[in-house]
UniProtKB/Swiss-Prot annotation:
GO biological process: carbohydrate transport; sodium ion transport; transmembrane transport
Family the entry assigns: Belongs to the sodium:galactoside symporter (TC 2.A.2) family.
Gene Ontology MF, one: symporter activity
Regions crossing the membrane: 31-51, 52-72, 84-104, 116-136, 162-182, 191-211, 230-250, 257-277, 318-338, 356-376, 383-403, 407-427, 450-470, 501-521
Record-given protein name: Uncharacterized symporter sll1374
CDD domains: MFS_MelB_like (cd17332)
One Pfam assignment: MFS_2
InterPro entries attached to this UniProt entry: MFS_2, MFS_trans_sf, Na/Gal_symport_CS
Source organism of this protein record: Synechocystis sp. (strain ATCC 27184 / PCC 6803 / Kazusa)
PANTHER family: MAJOR FACILITATOR SUPERFAMILY (MFS) PROFILE DOMAIN-CONTAINING PROTEIN (PTHR11328:SF24), MAJOR FACILITATOR SUPERFAMILY DOMAIN-CONTAINING PROTEIN (PTHR11328)
Length: 544
């Protein structure tokens, strides 16, 4: 017999380990989206148009490799499953190339020659990092529909994922703020140390997820006996790191009090301790075990890419999800990439305060994530998206009107923006497993990797063009790039207008598009229940 629609519940430790898998990609992506453009223009000294081109080329290459990795992941056959081997194999180069993004090599004493050398270097590193990012993150995202087919449980699972994602984003900003405070007026060293620490945290969290999770009907990477032996060691190591941080903070080891190193040790200790805790309690759910005579789930179809694209475009619900996701994340990342310029050049605040404003956004998003998750038990996903986006659009209107000196209003608007940002995290990714189910009903095949890859592909192409246009607009508006080692220059009025337009009206335009698409999204709770019932009936008939 197949699992009933109310079954396929996941243990708390499984959800926790799954959530940890998005911690590493989230903290790397968060620092990149908030500070990479600023780093390239104001620390490395690259003109804004070239800096925007670095981001565009990296993202377009990233978009190209998404469907390739998705198809390869779908077709992977191993005793551990289709997704976990990719996560495990890609995490080390992922961390190494991330660290390399924050280095500033010297190519020539001639300023123009050095700028072009840096441009080529950062393009190459961006392409390599984005390939590694896809290798670990895309198979991870495709795990959601494989771990459970329960409508509400998928939303809960994504709540854990985005709790780690938003929580990690918040913690990465705190780490940046502490590093900036500990290393004032040394931006190159700030970003260099930040890159190393973020990389270590990312590898640790990815290991936690890949080694604790088990794919449906497959062997775990760590045997039960090895899990039992490792659990107390990891927990002890985590506690030791936290105690070291506490001792350093209270000057018991000759330290300088609580600083970014203490905070880093605490984060690393929590990851290792959480890893050990989930290994200690790691009983496998019944529906994930390989049982005799159990019906097989849909298998991946070995079709050419163009034919798969044709099938994807024939799935009307999928097109809506792509549009909603693209609009939401263009709004998120356009605002994030320009925020530091807005805070410094328009509001007259320092770079460090851009981190605290971003914290207000993401802290609110983290809290609201659980509020929306609770409401999702009663409301359709598109209703939740509509409510959050309306609040968000109001905040964007306020950002256009806020004036220098109105700092309290700026933080208030950041909090309201966080209410909407949380739905951009939660809702599109909760919709896509339902689309995969609909595709299986129509085709008899499960192609999670392809759908997740193609969804992200379009998002990245759109984002690449958006970020390139931001850089190009800044350059055309007369934006003055900071010379390394010099104070931040005063921008002309034309550049200030371009910064304000990119931080408020432009994201609001994309949010409006997402709202319109959400209204017509066809898969409601009742429709999804009917899809799952038809799939279960088909599986039972095939088994008979």
């Amino acid at each position: 017999m197949s699992q009933s629609l109310s079954a396929e519940k996941l243990h708390f430790t499984t959800k926790l380990a799954y959530g940890a898998g998005d911690f590493g990609p989230a903290i790397t992506a968060n620092i990149l989206v908030f500070y990479l453009l600023f780093f390239l223009t104001d620390v490395a000294g690259i003109p804004a148009a070239l800096a925007g081109s670095v981001l565009m080329i990296g993202k377009i290459f990233d978009a190209i490799n998404d469907p390739i990795i998705g198809l390869l992941s779908d077709r992977t056959r191993s005793r551990w499953g289709r997704r976990l081997p990719w996560m495990l194999g890609g995490m080390i180069p992922f961390a190494l190339f991330y660290t390399a993004q924050w280095l500033i090599p010297h190519f020539s004493d001639d300023r123009l020659t050095n700028q072009w050398g840096l441009f080529i270097y950062y393009v190459a590193i961006a392409m390599a990092f984005n390939l590694c990012y896809t290798t670990v993150n895309l198979p991870y995202t495709a795990l959601t529909p494989e771990l459970t087919q329960n409508y509400n449980e998928r939303t809960r699972l994504n709540s854990f994922r985005f709790a780690f994602s938003i929580g990690g984003s918040i913690l990465s900003l705190i780490l940046y703020i502490l590093i900036a405070a500990g290393l004032p007026d040394r931006p190159q060293q700030q970003f260099g140390e930040l890159g190393v620490m973020i990389s270590v945290l990312s590898i640790s969290a990815l290991l936690w997820s890949a080694l604790r999770l088990q794919e449906k009907g497959k062997e775990p990477i760590l045997s039960p006996s090895l899990r039992r032996r490792l659990a107390p060691l990891l927990m002890a190591a985590g506690i030791t790191l936290i105690l070291l941080a506490i001792a350093k903070s209270f000057n018991l080891l000759g330290g300088s009090g609580f600083d970014y190193i203490s905070f880093f040790l605490i984060l690393l200790g929590l990851i290792w301790g959480g890893f050990g805790f989930t290994l200690r309690d790691s009983a496998v759910e019944e529906h994930l075990q390989k049982l005799e005579n159990s019906p097989s789930p849909g298998v991946t179809e070995n079709l050419p890419l163009l034919k798969q694209l044709k099938i994807a475009f024939s799935n009307r619900a999928f097109l809506f999800v792509i549009g909603i996701y693209l609009c939401s994340w263009l709004a998120v990342q356009l605002t994030a990439s320009i925020l530091v310029y807005f805070v410094v050049s328009w509001m007259g605040l320092n770079e460090q305060q851009s981190g605290t404003i971003a914290l207000a956004v993401q802290g609110t998003a983290l809290v609201m994530l659980f509020v929306w998750q609770a409401l999702a038990q009663f409301l359709d996903k598109k209703v939740i998206y509509f409510l959050g986006s309306m609040v968000w659009m109001g905040a964007e209107a306020g950002l256009w009107l806020v004036q220098p000196g109105q700092v309290a209003l700026l933080y208030t608007l950041a909090i309201f923006a966080g209410v909407g940002v949380s739905v951009a995290y939660l809702i599109p990714w909760s919709m896509i497993p339902d689309v995969v189910d609909l595709d299986e009903l129509n085709t008899g095949k499960r192609r999670e990797g392809f759908f997740y890859a193609f969804m992200v592909l379009l998002q990245k192409v759109g984002l690449a063009l958006g970020l390139f246009l931001v850089g190009l607009t800044l350059e055309a508006s007369g934006f003055i790039a900071r010379i390394p080692g010099e104070p931040i220059p005063i921008q002309p009025d034309s550049a200030l207008w371009a910064i304000r337009f990119a931080v408020a009206p432009l994201p609001a335009f994309f949010l409006l598009g997402g709202l319109i698409l959400a209204i017509f999204y066809p898969i409601t709770r009742a429709v999804h229940t009917d899809i799952r019932q038809q799939l279960q009936a088909r599986q039972q008939n095939n088994h008979i």
